A protein has these predicted regions:
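Short, acidic/polar
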Residues: 17-32, 84-95, 203-211, 260
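Acidic/histidine-rich catalytic cores of soluble enzymes
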Residues: 39-40, 142-252, 257, 307
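Conserved, mostly hydrophobic/aromatic
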Residues: 7, 32, 40, 59, ...
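Active-site mouth loops of central-metabolism enzymes
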Residues: 10-24, 76-84, 134-142
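Active-site acidic/histidine proton-transfer and metal-coordination neighborhood
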Residues: 65, 80-193
Length: 308
């Protein structure tokens, strides 16, 4: 039994494919391999090519696999739903053709996963981390979004891919009440959860408590750490979530506010989680000069705790 460390392109500032400052995807794969990661996420739709031959060659060269694909889009708008379903087909069409990662005993679903995140709403983006002032969806809008998530999960399942819903700061699934409501409305045989320690903390929740609470839904996990000084400054300003990340709200694992020894303990001794965790550290892509240093530091720290 083991918990394997993997990475994500957001550690190189890759969150918005329209950002003109993104590093070449080949550089990201190379540095992820150099840092010691055995796998990485595809990143936002359109960042890595959807050409299986091109991607396979680069992955093999860097001795790295793919742990998950990502839907990071507006899950609410009806007119965007066909676009999202096309993304599901395109992403699953490539990740299912790549070499599979090992499956650990006790791991409920094999990798690769499809992480599903709601995004793209200014009224929530500017209120990330502020449960008291962030607007909530009407019952009708919430039901529509849940229907879209079920459709996404069912399409992914038709490819043999497990969809996992990722509550994300600045989206319409962020806070405690929304995560609980999601868990009630989406059966666990339809989709699992990908809880993110950093997003939980950012949005007012204790990661240990929530990892324990939803152990039976937890198929995949993201790890982050948060710089306390920057975090407090960012929450006092009226800025978007990723603007705060650009200021340095996220930091290497083990250097911030989160208690990773306690997180390791709850995962290994209490809920007996097995499988994969992905390290993330969102940043401005113009600050990629320190990405390799930071992701290696996170990887080394997690190794010291017992993660593999």
């Amino acid at each position: 039994m083991a918990i394997h460390i993997t990475g994500a392109p957001c550690c190189w500032g890759v969150d918005d494919v329209k950002n003109p400052y993104l590093p070449p995807w080949q550089k990201v794969l190379y540095e992820a391999g150099q840092a010691g990661y055995k796998a990485i996420e595809l990143g936002p739709y359109g960042y890595l090519p959807l050409d299986i031959d091109v991607v396979s060659k680069e992955l093999e060269k860097n001795h790295i696999g793919i742990v998950a694909g990502t839907i990071f889009d507006d899950l609410l708008a009806e007119d965007n739903y066909p676009n999202v379903l096309k993304q599901v087909d395109d992403i699953c069409g490539i990740i299912t053709k790549l070499p599979k990662l090992p499956t650990e005993p006790g791991q409920r679903y094999p990798a690769p996963y499809l992480t599903v995140m709601d995004w793209g709403h200014d009224e929530r983006d500017y209120n990330a981390g502020h449960s008291d002032r962030a607007p909530r969806l009407s019952d009708e809008d919430w039901a529509r979004m849940m229907g879209h998530i079920k459709g996404i999960a069912e399409k992914a399942a038709s490819w043999g891919v497990r969809a996992v819903v990722h509550p994300h700061a600045g989206g319409y699934i962020e806070f405690a009440d929304e995560i609980d409501k999601l868990a009630r409305d989406i059966p666990k045989d339809v989709a699992g959860l990908c809880l993110d320690t950093g997003h939980l903390w950012y949005s007012g929740m204790d990661p240990v408590t929530w990892l324990r609470k939803y152990a039976d839904r937890l198929d995949y996990i993201h790890f982050k750490d948060i710089n306390e000084k920057v975090y407090k400054e960012v929450l006092s300003e009226h800025i978007r979530f990723f603007e705060g990340c650009g200021k340095g709200s996220m930091c290497p694992i083990g250097t911030g506010m989160l208690d990773y020894p306690a997180i390791y303990k709850v995962l290994t001794e209490e809920i007996h989680y097995n499988g994969y965790i992905t390290v993330e550290q969102e940043r401005d892509p113009r600050n990629v000069a320190t990405s390799l240093r930071d992701v290696k530091a996170s990887c080394d720290y997690l190794h010291s705790l017992g993660f593999e």
